[in-house]
Amino acid sequence: MTDVARPDVQACEQVRLTAWVRGRVQGVGFRWWVRARALELGLTGVARNLPDSRVEVVAEGPRERCAELLELLSGVPRHGRPGFVAGVTAEWSTARGGYSGFTQA
């Protein structure tokens, strides 16, 4: 009998991560950096500047990959992350679709 590896259901669950990033994150290439990391992770969504100087990141894909993006946004600066992140507020929800690739607005 052959054992078939079953993927972790939670890791494969399609989710939406909405993250609001505070700090010096506008005018420094931060959205372009987010887009590059999201595409590397196979995520879809958008990164956009908000009037209050935050950047909103909406990403959809497997929960595990979205969690990796959140760690890149909020963790110790690496991968040449531009600007300065003072804090990140995140919200998880069910993926809604509607994105084609990952854009910056």
Swiss-Prot record:
It catalyses: an acyl phosphate + H2O = a carboxylate + phosphate + H(+). The keyword Hydrolase applies. It comes from the Bacteria. GO terms for molecular function: acylphosphatase activity. InterPro entries: Acylphosphatase, Acylphosphatase-like_dom, Acylphosphatase-like_dom_sf, Acylphosphatase_CS. The keyword RNA-binding does not apply. It is an enzyme of class 3 (hydrolase). The active site is at R31, N49. This is Acylphosphatase. It comes from Acidothermus cellulolyticus (strain ATCC 43068 / DSM 8971 / 11B).
